[in-house]
Amino acid sequence: SGAGPSPDRFVALGSEGALGIITEGWARLQGRPTYKATAGYRFTDFFDAARAVRAVSQAGLYPANVRIVDGTELQVNGAGDGSFTLMVVSFESADHPVDAWMERAEECCLDHGGTVDVPWRDNPDAHLQGAVGAWRTAFIRMPYNREQLTPRGIISDTFETAITWDRFEEFY
């Protein structure tokens, strides 16, 4: 899951236990990251942000996290005024500095019309600042808010899917 491991998702929500019993498993562990960088970029056009994500993806950078959040979601969650789309990009490594990867990702964002929301260089708290930090706080709070909203018939969530780039704009 994009939200990380959680025993309740493995047992309660999956077929495990209902269709059989797990008798064996394995896990691959990585060292805890010592090098981290997060930045945020604002875009006036959602599809420009999507093009920046595509550029980062096709540059072979493999960020630990890259998300675009549209203006409506930012506004609903108190992370923006609805006038911009936010792209959050993060890199992590237990082995080596990530500056070169973050620099290239920033070039991709700026090349596609993004402007810096939160600078990353020499800023270990970038993930807590600006629209990036406000959205992060809302994202972490969302499961608790969902408990209050769902009984009232309000459902607001992120749905992940996969589609080819040439069909993305029409799909969105």
Task: Label each PLM-derived region with a short phrase.
Residues 27, 31, 37, 42-45, ...:
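C-terminal substrate-recognition/cap domain of FAD-linked oxidoreductases
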Residues 1-32:
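FAD-binding core of FAD-dependent oxidoreductases
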